[in-house]
């Protein structure tokens, strides 16, 4: 880790000494990095260079997902990491050296209200916001809750109420999503 060390006399205020010769800090030495992504060095998971700290906005990171989009039918896919924070959604690109590049302005100010709902699918990412069920694709963010109204005819629960605490799973084989809220299931 990056840091500075001194082998000399240090101030003893805020420290307590035990019977041995070690001085232990009494607390307050933790640092919270709620809006940072910390990356290890390429091919070395035990090395964390200073350029590997990427700040993502001002809010707390609540989830991440990968979004891959094909450039063309025969071209390679471009990978983007979608970062969900308490202040919006950020899209991070991978630079040529394998690290996340600088963070651009937010992709969207839409806030994910249920981190358990963040689900990657082929060419997209689902998540739940206060507006409803959202889908991120290479074309942007779309609210698809309106398209799903009436699909839950066998229940008297409003769709927006149902998805607030629901988990989402993607069935790759059948290309379908499962929206499950255990607290709303009938016995």
PLM region descriptions:
Residues 64-187:
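Beta-sheet-dominated scaffold domains
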Residues 1-92, 182-187:
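N-terminal beta-propeller domains
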